[in-house]
Amino acid sequence: MKGDTRHLNGEEDAGGREDSILVNGACSDQSSDSPPILEAIRTPEIRGRRSSSRLSKREVSSLLSYTQDLTGDGDGEDGDGSDTPVMPKLFRETRTRSESPAVRTRNNNSVSSRERHRPSPRSTRGRQGRNHVDESPVEFPATRSLRRRATASAGTPWPSPPSSYLTIDLTDDTEDTHGTPQSSSTPYARLAQDSQQGGMESPQVEADSGDGDSSEYQDGKEFGIGDLVWGKIKGFSWWPAMVVSWKATSKRQAMSGMRWVQWFGDGKFSEVSADKLVALGLFSQHFNLATFNKLVSYRKAMYHALEKARVRAGKTFPSSPGDSLEDQLKPMLEWAHGGFKPTGIEGLKPNNTQPVVNKSKVRRAGSRKLESRKYENKTRRRTADDSATSDYCPAPKRLKTNCYNNGKDRGDEDQSREQMASDVANNKSSLEDGCLSCGRKNPVSFHPLFEGGLCQTCRDRFLELFYMYDDDGYQSYCTVCCEGRELLLCSNTSCCRCFCVECLEVLVGTGTAAEAKLQEPWSCYMCLPQRCHGVLRRRKDWNVRLQAFFTSDTGLEYEAPKLYPAIPAARRRPIRVLSLFDGIATGYLVLKELGIKVGKYVASEVCEESIAVGTVKHEGNIKYVNDVRNITKKNIEEWGPFDLVIGGSPCNDLSNVNPARKGLYEGTGRLFFEFYHLLNYSRPKEGDDRPFFWMFENVVAMKVGDKRDISRFLECNPVMIDAIKVSAAHRARYFWGNLPGMNRPVIASKNDKLELQDCLEYNRIAKLKKVQTITTKSNSIKQGKNQLFPVVMNGKEDVLWCTELERIFGFPVHYTDVSNMGRGARQKLLGRSWSVPVIRHLFAPLKDYFACE
């Protein structure tokens, strides 16, 4: 099959709903109070074509920033600091192979994440799952038919937020003659304590016929007041809701063919076409297992919906006071999947009464101090955080100024990307005058790869997600806009770029995406020799611009670090090092390779395998002091003084790749502060002018807010260095510090192995020059959209051997071959380590300050 496409699921959980008021067909600029969440899931793959469900652009950057709260609601299933998201034990899925050899399934929870079950994007345009029922009255959206890491048991649409200025279209690409829908949400944010104290509260809906109107919803359509339904609006996933009277919403009456619904979980209201509602009784066809596994908000919404159904059906379930949310949900879900027996769907119907919000059991957002959110004013979409505020009653909507607008009216700035492209094509404006990602005027930064700018929102998203890669090694999002719902993957095995259909259609030309799907192989616009394609024009100096883009994200300006003059050779002495989160002693290895004498090397490390490597390979010259959290100021004074403090705290709870991450202030993220206070303990006392250096490392794909907080504490901005410049593998990392010349260009030495073939053993042939980022996961070894083995030996494909992995990272051969460790354990050690050539580049200037051998 030709074509290399990746479908991104545009489904957004109902928690991601955006407020929109349609006036003469235009969407008013509604502010948003709740940030969106990023949930990336992968879907089945057809040979030559890949699909994945992604969030859309403006939600993605803020989305990831709140997973800390998403997983911190006390459910306990998410967040233990592991490098992979922890799924609930309730529904673990197993991978199933497709009957067709051209179709592969990949499931997030399965043993192998490289296989996906996916119907052909050309043969089916609807969302499909194993339990899809043709008789369902709802037509699934066409453009987001497939999901990343889709589950094999049910149609499981995944969140993919639309743009910040979205007009919610409820038609699902079908004709809708009932007018334009209106969605109403409440401006509120969640306090941190709400996630703990709010429990499973939600706005209580009770029967109150006095608030109803006997003539309401008399349009011949299904569903009346009080009916429990699944709600569907274009761009968002199925979410449980209850049909309510317009009087409960403090809004106008619904238009003919429309219904006001209140969403379970956060109590927001939306006006939805009756044709986009399905009875809650059709549970198995619309229950989203992938979303259930990922989102606390979805699980809570399920609990509230099934609790209401249970009460109506007179059903009881055994429970005990200590039961968790999952313990309570398990029998409920079994009951729902079993058809709500014994009463069935009939038992879920209301008693012809009008449900309204019980004012005595809810609190208005204005009744308590709201936690400020960076994206609070930018998008109004439900997130997992909102579920914790489910006991708030929706208050009247109010307009709020965009947080990046500096108080100006943005009416003159807003324009569509189509309009921008048209103006550029007609020489009415310049590409640099608009955001290449969304079209907004007056960008605040340049696009690093293509001519054009980036607005503040798109710039932050680009900073967070550009270096985020999937398990197959490709970028998680479009190279142009860092979002996209359907992505086309470059066929060049050494290229990791992908481009979304929207960017191709708007910037290159209408019909370009369709043509690209038919091309095999297809080369992306970073690989093609010509620079210009429509209004998409690759910069001549894109590689320099890319480096400058990440290093120019200053956020705040800090004083330049103190510069120490070089020490005369006769006065230089051995270096004394404190290494926190030492790993496999990369710092010590590099210092010895540079010929710098090491007077003492005190290392904090808790991994026994890492300690074994450092002890054996460096013959006991490293003093290990165990857990960094147990080191005191007195210890530093006893072990010191130190000339160099280095470290890189675990990235599990900082990396955007981990949907269950907790952020900088929870989980392993807070270990950064251990580095911070030990660094301060190690600094020379006032009046001591001896040279003192330090360096802190972490991932690039982190939340912009976390990055800037780290910079604020360390009082400097990071430099970004990708190991691809000095090795055979991608590995982009941020480095903070005061090492001399940290921001100088990275130049490979003659001994650096820049291509994979240079790293292989005898009689082994590399199938590509460079490999993607190697992580602790075994599937990171395979390359490309087809998950190819990178090596051929005696005519057979093979994975990389441990010795070859060591060469790629710059370590000596057999460096990790200690303590009878197996291949998997050795790869985990390497996957958490630093790239030796990069650290050598950073440490090289220290030769002017310390004695050398």
Curated annotation (Swiss-Prot):
GO CC entries: catalytic complex; nucleoplasm; nucleus
Gene Ontology BP terms: methylation; negative regulation of transcription by RNA polymerase II; positive regulation of gene expression
Residue ranges, compositional bias (Basic and acidic residues): 1-20, 368-385, 407-417
Domain PWWP: 225-283
Modulation of this protein's activity: Activated by binding to the regulatory factor DNMT3L.
Maturation and modification: Sumoylated.
Function: Required for genome-wide de novo methylation and is essential for the establishment of DNA methylation patterns during development. DNA methylation is coordinated with methylation of histones. May preferentially methylates nucleosomal DNA within the nucleosome core region. May function as transcriptional co-repressor by associating with CBX4 and independently of DNA methylation. Seems to be involved in gene silencing.
Name of this chain's protein: DNA (cytosine-5)-methyltransferase 3B
Protein encoded by which gene: DNMT3B
